Amino acid sequence: MKKTILSFTAVSLLLFPALSSCRTGSGSPTVQPEPASAQETADGGEEVNPYTYLGPGYTFSDGVLTAAPATEDKTEARFSGAFLDAGAENYRMDVTLALDSLYSSAGVLFAASESTAYDGIEGYAFTLRDKRVYLYDLTGSSFSGLMPAELASKSVERPKTGAEIRLRVEKNGNTYRCYYLDDAEGVDPWPEFEFVLTDHRGSGVGAVDNGHGAVFTSLSCEPIEENTVPGKTYRNPVFRDLQAADPGVLKVDGKYYCYSTSAPIGYYVYVSEDLVNWTNEGLCMNEAWGLSRSGFYWAPEVVRRADGKFVMVCSVEEHLGFAVADSPLGPFVPETNWTFDKTIDGHIFLDEDGRGYLFYVSWRSGHDYGIWACELEDDLVTVKPGTEVPVISPTDAWEQVSGRVTEGPFVLKHNGLYYLTYSGNGYDAKEYAVGYAVSESPLGPYEKYKANPILSYTSKLYGPGHHSFTVSPDGSELIIVYHTHASTTAVHPRTICIDRARFAPTESGVDRLEIFGPTHTAQEYPK
């Protein structure tokens, strides 16, 4: 079967507006059969089934669409679905459902049609199971059941027991967006996945499940106006022909300076005014501490000190140390000696009270592999004795898919809380991803977000990981700068991407860090 996805985006979570009535058609919307909330009867008083296709196990009664369990084997999936014609070129499809068991997966069927190649249907599905959403390409038959090919998946917060599950799919031209609607009211939704189809296969929309049972209590479809991305647009990766990884970005006087793993020995500095177009301004630091092993100059970051000088923390042959310069372009002069051995991925966080903290990954004597932190003296190159503590270790399953790794720390402060972001898994795994933890103190203790990771791979972008944050040119948007693999078949040379991030309110009162990415579709330039 020919795959039709040309470009793809996986994105962070968001909210839902109230479900609207089911309307189809172009132009002025006309109310059509509303399968989950209105019973339509024929002249003889019998309820009319509005669906043009009802798969095995699906029944429509009393205005409710039900998918009966098709298997008792919890390891088996027997996908089936039901759909009707969307009736509109661009639409918003909302589904409210309840799952029968922990093994149930169900959601929205879209771009569907009765298949000429199969005795059944084909299309796409956006589903929820437990605490994960999935995007599938579906083909199959009524004999074997629908055959799902996973295009992407993402962790989300598990629905509360008995809570209604709300999913949405929007079609806008050739672009589709899939939403898990669980945020607080008043927040505009961001999609979990965004992708482009050139062959829509069909115009059917409806419901789908994996054969373990679901009840669809509401389905509604309404036309929307097509809109395009306003202004100038970019597509990831923004570095294009430039090769770099582990980006640390500093904004100074309206310009962005990106320091990264790129030069064989030393560090290049890349400069931009808009975060999209970058130029290599050459080496900003040469050899440090007599260490000349090519390819082992990793993950630099730079901050501006109170006296106006610039301090770089860098990893050289698995030694962590500091270098100082008068300009963000360098030259950075290394301190007399490194600070720690068997340590990498340094990050300096400057708190509002002027205190500096160093975060890093260490496995030296007495240290378990993970992220550590300590307080710095005012010079930002000297560690305060007795302040070193472990803050993050690879204890969660998603951090152990490829090795046991938590690395690449970066700290944001929001509403008085400290958000420590980091990457999990080996950098060369497609599952290399970004998560975060929250604390009331810069040195912890930190509590990991229960729906990590918040940035993970898709069928188009592998290994989105080591990162830093900055703000857009006008300061109104939070931007994450991160690297990905060269392609889905090669890790190197890695390249740099940018996407939007934000803090979204939750019922707990602790805002959730969300990322609109990793994107592969056209996005508006940072404001």
Question: Which role does the model predict for each range below?
Answer:
Residues 1-9:
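Bacterial N-terminal signal peptides that target proteins for export
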Residues 18-21:
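C-terminal motif of bacterial Sec signal peptides marking the signal peptidase cleavage site
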Residues 25, 29, 33, 40-54, ...:
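Beta-rich carbohydrate-recognition and catalytic domains
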Residues 57-75:
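Short carbohydrate-recognition loop motifs
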Residues 72-139:
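Secretory/extracellular carbohydrate-interaction modules
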Residues 93-95, 159-193:
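Carbohydrate-binding surfaces in secreted/extracellular proteins
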Residues 189-217:
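Flexible glycan-contacting loops in extracellular carbohydrate-active proteins
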